């Protein structure tokens, strides 16, 4: 990559990757405020926010991203450009200004804004608004109530607060050329590919329709007729009476040795579509996954019986008593929604499955290793680029953007002030529902403000975004224990507002490269966020009130899809960090104090790698050892399971290694299109199945609809532990 000193041409970017991907031209006459943009953008945002929230409670929660909309809206946009009338007419109150439903051909700038709308509908890649989890755990797990208005304010303010941080930092991490945001180049490449002239017999649009129909038609098989195909765990079939064999072979509750799926939702759940992940990322995830699942976990469980691991399932996100029974969480919550210490001491300390304990330890290590790794391997580069961003000349893209009216700073200041005031009112006047005191909001906002700039710089220059959710949970758990909802509210305001800010800034940089007027970006992001958040809570409220025993796996009908795996982990985190508190889990009063050593191990790991790199500079493979990626490879487990990882790695390797290497022209034309079509086809069929047979509770009952047939995988292996449905040694 060229450095700033080596670079002198003022008409190109100083970053080589940007020079190769982003055009240095702009046509400011292209219309962006078109009927097509608003029509397709609002529909896309509404549809994605509905579908993503709808799927979020399912066992395999498919996340439909903006790429689906990017591909699907292209032919629709061209169709509207052909059929809409071109007549120009005036609008009341607009003077002599004229407006047309069809100002000309469907252009790339319209397409970008539609995709930004869609990105808001997918909560910027997260699926649904993170704060919806608070409403879910209150209603479905704790069995308490929260008002709709309190829930809506939580969702909207936590997202818009992130927008305020983004506005304050836009000048520092969007406009400078050296803040180049590598992930945006994928989007730029896709937009350019989609808008190139397509003279092939099999156009991208035709391929998309064919693949969508196939995906739509096939999903009825694993989605309704033969649900066992979601996790084909053949080891369990071969050893129907062996607990150990089923622990090893279960794709949903075990190590998943040999388990695979024929269900796209299982492939793309949690980790998103493997077709859009580069192979080097897949390889890093594979190494980290294999090390944990097939080496560390078996050794800790069967080899050392660490923390009495064999008293509990090997793979579970549930919480347990010391004798292996499921912990009765509601029993230790008093009428004030706080920890009942006497009832807690009666049940005893909370115990985790070996896998769940290791994931927290690896989470600690990942946080520490990320900071150390970035400081050692990228610190000088980040410092140089940030210095250049102040002193360096404007690049061609920043100069081209000067043609458009900038966003006044007072827009962001006003938004930030209003959001903080509304949030303070929420904490003061609805404190009985959210528990968080006003000083908690101030502390969370201060943490978000402090961390947003360095995290944005790291993401903009290295494409790594350190996850700081555990830090916020840990801090609030130490300061204000015994109050679960206060803890998760603190996490959402502190961590997620920062994460949202990074996502907003990423979109701003995409608009910067695509030469989208900044005020158009502002309004589309803001309107999309409000619309998506409102639809998220409306759909969640409907599902929580209409699906009987939703999220209660032990009370749901067999093989019900409404198990809420992500919210189960969110609930467990509220218990561990908020209700019981880290002192009683990872401190002197808990069983897992030794897990804190993972912080030190994670911090020292990159130092060792960096030292080896300095000692042996000719060994080119040493700096490729990326410990944050390796340690964080299984960050989505739980709720993700072994079958999700197995299938994601397999499919990603096929397409992004073999197809990419040996059929590159096909990959360039159709890979992203296929990914979008698979997501869309499954989404439409799943919704159709729910409204046609799901609401009527019409289900099939035969061997192929009774799960993966690994019922013994949930059993402990220690002697004398009694669990319903499990053999006693």
From Swiss-Prot:
Residues spanning the membrane: 37-57, 61-81, 123-143, 148-168, 177-194, 207-227, 256-276, 279-299, 352-372, 410-430, 438-458, 522-542, 592-612, 621-637, 640-660, 673-693
Residues carrying Phosphoserine: 8
Membrane topology: Multi-pass membrane protein
Span of the signal peptide: none
Pfam families, sorted: OPT
MF terms (GO), sorted A to Z: oligopeptide transmembrane transporter activity
Keywords from the named record: Acetylation, Membrane, Peptide transport, Phosphoprotein, Protein transport, Transmembrane, Transmembrane helix, Transport
Functional note: Involved in the translocation of tetra- and pentapeptides across the cellular membrane in an energy-dependent manner.
Protein name: Oligopeptide transporter 4
Classification of source organism: Eukaryota, Viridiplantae, Streptophyta, Embryophyta, Tracheophyta
């Amino acid at each position: 990559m060229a450095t700033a000193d080596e670079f002198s041409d003022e008409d190109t970017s100083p970053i080589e990757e940007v020079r190769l991907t982003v055009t240095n031209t702009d046509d400011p006459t292209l219309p962006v405020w078109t009927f097509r943009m608003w029509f397709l953008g609002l529909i896309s945002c509404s549809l994605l926010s509905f579908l993503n929230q709808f799927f979020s409670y399912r066992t395999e929660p498919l996340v439909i991203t903006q790429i689906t909309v990017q591909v699907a809206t292209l032919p629709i946009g061209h169709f509207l450009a052909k059929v809409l009338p071109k007549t120009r007419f005036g609008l009341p109150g607009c003077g002599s200004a004229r407006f047309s439903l069809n100002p000309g051909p469907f252009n790339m700038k319209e397409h970008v804004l539609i995709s930004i709308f869609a990105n808001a509908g997918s909560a910027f890649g997260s699926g649904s608004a993170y704060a919806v989890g608070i409403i879910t755990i209150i209603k479905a797990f704790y069995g308490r109530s929260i008002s709709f208005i309190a829930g809506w304010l939580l969702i909207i303010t936590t997202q818009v607060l992130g927008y305020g941080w983004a506005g304050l930092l836009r000048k520092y991490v969007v406009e400078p050329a050296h803040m180049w945001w590598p992930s945006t180049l994928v989007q730029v490449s896709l937009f350019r590919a989609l808008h190139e002239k397509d003279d092939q017999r099999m156009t991208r649009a035709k391929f998309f329709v064919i693949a969508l129909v196939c995906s739509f038609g096939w999903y009825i098989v694993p989605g309704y007729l033969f649900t066992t195909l979601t996790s084909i765990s053949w080891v369990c079939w071969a050893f129907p009476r062996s607990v150990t064999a089923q622990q090893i072979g279960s794709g949903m509750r075990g190590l998943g040795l040999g388990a695979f799926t024929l269900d796209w939702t299982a492939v793309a759940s949690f980790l998103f579509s493997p077709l859009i992940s580069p192979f080097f990322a897949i390889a890093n995830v594979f190494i980290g996954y294999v090390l944990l699942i097939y080496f560390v976990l078996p050794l800790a469980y069967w080899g050392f019986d660490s923390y009495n691991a064999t008293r509990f399932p090997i793979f579970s996100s549930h919480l347990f008593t010391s004798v292996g029974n499921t912990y009765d969480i509601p029993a230790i919550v008093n009428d004030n929604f706080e920890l009942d210490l006497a009832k807690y001491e009666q049940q005893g300390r909370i115990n985790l499955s070996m896998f769940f304990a290791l994931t927290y330890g690896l989470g600690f290590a990942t946080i520490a290793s990320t900071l150390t790794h970035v400081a050692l391997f990228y610190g000088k580069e980040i410092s140089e680029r940030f210095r250049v961003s102040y002193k360096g000349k404007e690049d061609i893209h920043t100069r081209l953007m000067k043609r458009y009216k900038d966003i006044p700073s007072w827009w962001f200041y006003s938004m930030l002030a209003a959001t903080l005031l509304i949030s303070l009112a929420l904490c003061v006047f609805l404190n009985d529902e959210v528990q968080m005191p006003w000083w908690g909001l101030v502390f969370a906002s201060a943490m978000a403000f402090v961390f947003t700039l360095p995290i944005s710089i790291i993401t903009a220059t290295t494409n790594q975004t350190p996850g700081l959710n555990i830090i916020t949970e840990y801090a609030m758990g130490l300061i204000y224990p015994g109050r679960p909802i206060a803890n998760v509210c603190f996490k959402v305001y502190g961590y997620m507002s920062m994460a949202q800010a990074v996502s907003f800034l990423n979109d701003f940089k995409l608009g910067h490269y695509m030469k989208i007027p900044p005020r158009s970006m502002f309004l589309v992001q803001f309107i999309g966020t409000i619309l998506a958040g409102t639809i998220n809570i409306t759909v969640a409220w409907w599902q929580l009130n209409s699906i009987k025993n939703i999220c209660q796996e032990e009370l749901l009908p067999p093989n019900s899809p409404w198990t809420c795996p992500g919210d189960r982990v969110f609930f467990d985190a509220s218990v561990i960090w908020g209700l019981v508190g880290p002192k009683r889990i990872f401190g002197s009063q808990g069983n897992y104090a030794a897990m804190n050593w993972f912080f030190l191990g994670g911090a020292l790991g990159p130092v060792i790698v960096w030292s080896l790199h300095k000692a042996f500079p000719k060994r080119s493979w040493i700096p490729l050892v990326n410990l944050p990626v390796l340690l964080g490879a299984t960050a989505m487990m739980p709720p993700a399971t072994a079958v999700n990882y197995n299938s994601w790695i397999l499919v990603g390797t096929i397409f992004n290694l073999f197809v990419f290497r040996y059929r590159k022209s096909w990959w360039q034309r159709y890979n992203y299109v296929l990914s979008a079509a698979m997501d869309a086809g499954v989404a439409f069929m799943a919704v159709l199945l729910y409204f046609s047979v799901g609401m009527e509770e019409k289900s099939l009952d035969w061997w192929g609809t009774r799960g993966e047939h690994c019922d013994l995988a949930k059993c402990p292996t220690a002697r004398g532990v009694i669990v319903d449905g499990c053999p006693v040694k």
